[in-house]
Amino acid sequence: MQRFNINWTAKTLCNQMKKGAVNFDNAVQRSLVWDDSKKSLLIHSMLYGFAIPAMYFTRDENGVYDSLDGKQRSNAICEYMNDEFCLTMDTPPVMDDDGNEEDFTGMSYSQLPEWAQDRIKDFSLTIYYYDGMTE
């Protein structure tokens, strides 16, 4: 069994999920449990450029990734980028590139200014994956 790492942007992760190249239906993954407040704090961390913990996948012979860790984060990111929830009212403000404080509470992804959308979609996610892992 070998471990590799890749860096995907949030946009790449969502595209891979959309085309079925990432699977979250396995015994080690719990069901989706994060509420919008927790999801909003993750998006806030991305807007600020804070480090997000790495995700862990296995990869099968067809190149499909099976998630070992990262289901909540992956789904929160893609749900937000697909306008499936708005940032909650307790989401802290964010600084723009000029040092101005911006309040995005109650906003969906498509309502954000372009610079904020870019920070999210271009956010780099570290993914470790294992080839040759058996059940």
Question: Where are the language model's segments positioned?
Answer:
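A short, surface-exposed helix-loop junction/capping segment
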Residues: 19-27
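Basic- and aromatic-enriched surface patches that contact anionic nucleotides/nucleic acids
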Residues: 1-12, 26-36, 40-135
